[in-house]
From Swiss-Prot:
Keyword terms, alphabetized: Ribonucleoprotein, Ribosomal protein, RNA-binding, rRNA-binding
Organism in which the protein naturally occurs: Staphylococcus aureus (strain NCTC 8325 / PS 47)
Subunit structure: Part of the 30S ribosomal subunit. Forms a tight complex with proteins S10 and S14.
The protein's name: Small ribosomal subunit protein uS3
Record field: transmembrane: none
Any one GO BP annotation for this protein: translation
Gene encoding the protein: rpsC
Family: Belongs to the universal ribosomal protein uS3 family.
């Protein structure tokens, strides 16, 4: 059912492409674990750089990494110093030659992961869960989103009984496979425990294109 499954996984190969673009028969497990290690390392190193997602391509003994970020200047650093440090660390981590490409996200309020992390960060700073959700919805709709839904769950406002509250505006057609829906979840560590944040953003319809190499955009 469209409302239960992860909207991104449901659309991979139809209107969304894979974030890992490689194939291996014998070494699949070890390369998959290496991918997970790379993603975790980048998330830890670039915590404050608004990283949305990371794409990994492999060719022989070389790894091409595309980092989609809302703050490219922070990733690159002055004169490329920060990206050079990151490349050297990834070279040592993987024992392979790593090439990094930084891609700027121009509209950060239309990226579900960045919106979810922003809400979580504000909740950690004791902001009102109602206000931060409504503000996120207003900003996304102003930038041209067709619809957005947010949900915060846990001990809201320090209540003894955990609950979930969600707000939405516009339409979010989860069953429509050609609907470009971005989804993400984040966690906020508060004094009362963890709060879960979920965000769905509908950015319009995308017509699927035929791809003989195995789907995707």
């Amino acid at each position: 059912m469209g409302q239960k499954i992860n909207p991104i996984g449901l659309r991979v190969g139809i209107i969304r492409d894979w974030e890992a673009k490689w194939y291996a028969e014998k070494d699949f497990a070890s390369l998959l674990h290496e991918d997970l290690k790379i993603r975790k390392f980048i998330d830890n190193e670039l915590k404050e750089a608004s990283v949305s997602h990371v794409e990994i391509e492999r060719a022989a003994n070389r790894i091409n990494i595309a980092i989609h970020t809302g703050k490219p200047g922070m990733v690159i650093g002055k004169g490329g110093s920060e990206i050079e440090k990151l490349r050297n660390k990834l070279n040592a981590l993987t024992d392979k030659k790593v090439h990094i490409n930084v891609i700027e996200i121009k509209k950060v309020d239309l990226d579900a992961r960045l919106v979810a992390e922003n809400i979580a960060r504000q909740l950690e700073n004791r902001a009102s869960f109602r206000r931060v959700q409504k503000q996120a919805i207003t900003r996304a709709m102003k930038l041209g989103a067709k619809g957005i839904k947010t949900q915060v769950s846990g001990r809201l406002g320090g209540a003894d009984i955990a609950r979930a509250e969600q707000y939405s505006e516009g339409t979010v057609p989860l069953h429509t496979l050609r609907a470009d829906i971005d989804y993400a979840h984040a966690e906020a560590d508060t004094t009362y425990g963890k709060l879960g944040v979920k965000v769905w953003i509908y950015r319009g319809e995308v017509l699927p294109t035929k791809n003989t190499s195995g789907g995707g955009k």
